[in-house]
């Protein structure tokens, strides 16, 4: 029996995602999802020993392709998908 180790499929519809290496956290959130133009907001945070939630360090917008590349790069580097690490603000 052949068992393949395929990566999970990238969703075609917008979805939030979280990655962590245990100290740093990335939150991927779709902000523009039109047929020909998709962007995600990526927020980076870092856990500090005396804090209840990660310290938010940086926020940037990436194209869908850039976000997918970053996600795959982090997974290859040992990061893991995780549950939400903070309550992100609601979309307007």
Q: Model regions: which residues?
A:
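Terminus-proximal functional modules
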Residues: 1-92
């Amino acid at each position: 029996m052949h068992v393949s180790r395929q990566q999970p499929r990238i969703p075609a519809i917008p979805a939030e995602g979280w990655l962590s290496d245990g100290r740093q956290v990335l939150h991927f959130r779709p902000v523009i999802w039109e047929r020909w133009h998709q962007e995600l907001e990526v927020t980076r945070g870092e856990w500090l020993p005396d804090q209840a939630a990660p310290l938010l360090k940086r926020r940037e917008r990436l194209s869908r392709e850039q976000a997918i590349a970053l996600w795959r790069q982090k997974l290859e580097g040992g990061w893991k998908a995780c549950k939400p690490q903070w309550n992100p603000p609601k979309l307007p």
